Amino acid sequence: MDTASPEEIDALKRHYLKKELFSLLIADELNFVSEPTNLDHLGSPFVEKGKSVIPYEKSQIPVLRFIFKRFILTFPFLDPDSQNQLWNVNFRNLLKSLSKSNVSVLPDDSDATHLHKWLLKFQNMLTLLMSRAFHSIQDEKNINIELLDTPKLEKDLHKSELQQKPNILEAYVLGVRQSTQAKMLRTKRVYEYLIKVSYEENTFFIARKYSDFSHFHHLLLKSYPNAYVPRLPPKDDHDTYLNSSEDSTLSPLPSRSSDTNDPQSDSQHVLRQERMRIELRQYIKNILNDDELHLTEEVLSFLTDDPVTLTASELTDINFRQELDVIRQLEQQKFVEIASQRAKELDVYMEEFKRSLTENNGFTTLFTELKEKNSISELSPSLQKTIEWARVNLASTIYDTFIGKEKSLETYLQIKKMHQLFPYTVIKNIMRFSNPLSVMKRILDTLLAQPFGMKSLFQRLLSISLNENVRAIHKLISRYEARIVSPEILTKIQEQVENPCKAAREVLEKKQMKRHDYLYFILISDDVPPKLPDNLIRRVYAERTAWKAALDSEDYPTDPTVIRRSKRYGYMMKLMHLYAKQFNKRRSISLISEGATGEIMKSMVDSPELNPNILVEQFIDLVRRHEDSFYDFVHRVYLHDSGLFASLMEWIENIIGFLRQGTSAPIDMDLVVDALDEESRQALDVELNKLLKWNQRKKSALFLRKTTKYIPGEETSLPVTMDELGIDEEIMAELRGDEDDQDENDQVTKVEEEHMEDDDSVEEFDPIIEERQRMKRKANRPANIIPPKPKLRTVKTLLPAFKEQVYPILHKFVSENEKDI
């Protein structure tokens, strides 16, 4: 962007100023309408009894009212005869429930942050709609890839390769062996992970249990409090099963007497702790790639002490797993290459398809062909190629969801639980109906029915993971409550989390306190009931002082009193976080039980175990086997349609037309800033420079994320770009947001939940160490994370002048094009 001309810079500033003002305008209107009593400003059907409809020109939310009337009320699947019940009763009640649930109970409350992200995505979607439809008299320009600092991006992209350490010490977790450990009344099966180590020209093997990894991890955290220690993966007891017929190309596995009682062992080979081995291998790799840790005394001791001699069966097991690693890596690489190659080959046909889609009545023409043709083979060549492209992308998505991603197993287990409850037979019978309205109505009736006042299937499906999470959190709460030994403190923390008093709410709304300061405030403030006795206030003061001292010191504290006090304060912070999570989860369950509606997606479920012989063709064939049946269903539904699909196509084309053509009158952005004095103009210019740099950094982060991470099925991998449909691709990327970013406390809680029943395998939670690590992770945010947005005080002052430009233009457009707004 340094090479851009002054005219281009001005056009960029103008564009992002307009977009920012639209974002502020829509946020202002959304904040107004978040109060259920203000819904009347959306016009009919939001009309309370005894009141008349508020005219459009007197509405406080004209933009939202326009969007609601033009794009939401006109959605074809909504029954015109039940609009009043749907919006004025059901939606109003739902908004009341959501407004109660949209209260943050903690500073940096992770659950409130998740809700805020969804609301922000909705706000960005509306910003996308309006900023593209309202043009400016002056030239505008947005940041594209040519304006990014490409050399710097390439440097960031290959940064990890440049940071590889000399091969002084190498270690690979290659195998797993099983032993037994005697307990008082029973024997326990224990697994040791076999690690091949190369150090100072010597190569040998060591064996380490998961508990050894846990002790080692805790030692690193304590010995190097200012270093970023990679996370130890949670314990995973799952084994991997390979069908005998599918691993014929691999070396034979050794027979094991311990497997004779396994019902699956006759037809399948068992790889014990395979997923855990892979994750621990990555953990060791991350440590050895860290400048501060890779040759420390602790690492050398862990990886070089007590070498072992392996048996023939253990060496055979290692060889088998190594062959599997090679096949797995080649398979994944081949899948990506073939899927990408297929998609590129289809680009030429996709260009033709995109052009036809964006023409007038493009969607109508498309679905008319689906109605007239009885099978895929009868479709036009371009549409057949489009279906082939969709087949490849869907196959990639299936592969990515159930195998390729780190969370694939977790996703599979969640879907499997829902799969066990889902009434496939009932849904199959419903799908026999050809009329789409009948199909949708009967499916909703099935999902939302509450026989004898019991929970509906929809509520049960959504509550599965929430209820399990609440039970796990309750166990953790009991564990930490036992360490505080002060009922008064526990009661006060829980009361202020679940029902903050006025003083606490004011602090939360200002969002100026960190979590440890907020805990101190609610415990000692006289304005926050109930008041603690003086001896407890003195204790809290001493513990908070010790906590700050422990975090501010370079090394881990050595004074036992400081350690005891600071840990207790950390436990109180942990409890406050757990109380908040438990409260938020229960609020979510309550909201579901109140009848909140949503969409449920049913997925085909099969075994998630990694098959070393899976190729891309098998996934594509999986999709191909079902596509004819799916097309036949769509064709028959459309054939018997009574106008619903035609209305849907018209509705979609209405949105695309509005985005492409926009309003008749443009905005004069120079007029918006005319009222500013010279000092304010200079301040505005500084803010716009910051806004421009932030957008450049954000776009660079999105580019890095797109380039370094293979995500099949995302919009970024689709040949159809949003810009070609009149949609801002940058905002679409922003809508996807930081899905990979997780709250640090959530991750710690999740790890603790994994080990609730296995206390011996994990070191005791140390709040001092964890807080240091959290701060270190926050300071070392990767390059592909969107940076915080700069504060824009002067830009906000332009909002009234901007509204004076936008509202009359919108009112004129409404008067010329709309009948009932």
UniProtKB/Swiss-Prot annotation:
Residues where Phosphothreonine is found: 260, 597
One GO term describing the cellular component: mitochondrial membrane
Transmembrane domains' residue ranges: none
Main location: mitochondrion
Domain PX span(s) in chain numbering: 171-310
Stretches with biased composition (Polar residues): 241-268
Keywords per UniProt: Membrane, Mitochondrion, Phosphoprotein
Record localization: Mitochondrion membrane
InterPro entries, sorted: LEC1-like, LEC1-like_C, PX-associated, PX_dom, PX_dom_sf
Membrane topology: Peripheral membrane protein
SMART domains cross-referenced by the UniProt entry: PX
Modified sites of kind Phosphoserine: 761
Record comment regarding domains: The PX domain binds phosphatidylinositol 3-phosphate which is necessary for peripheral membrane localization.
Protein name stated in the entry: PX domain-containing protein C1450.12
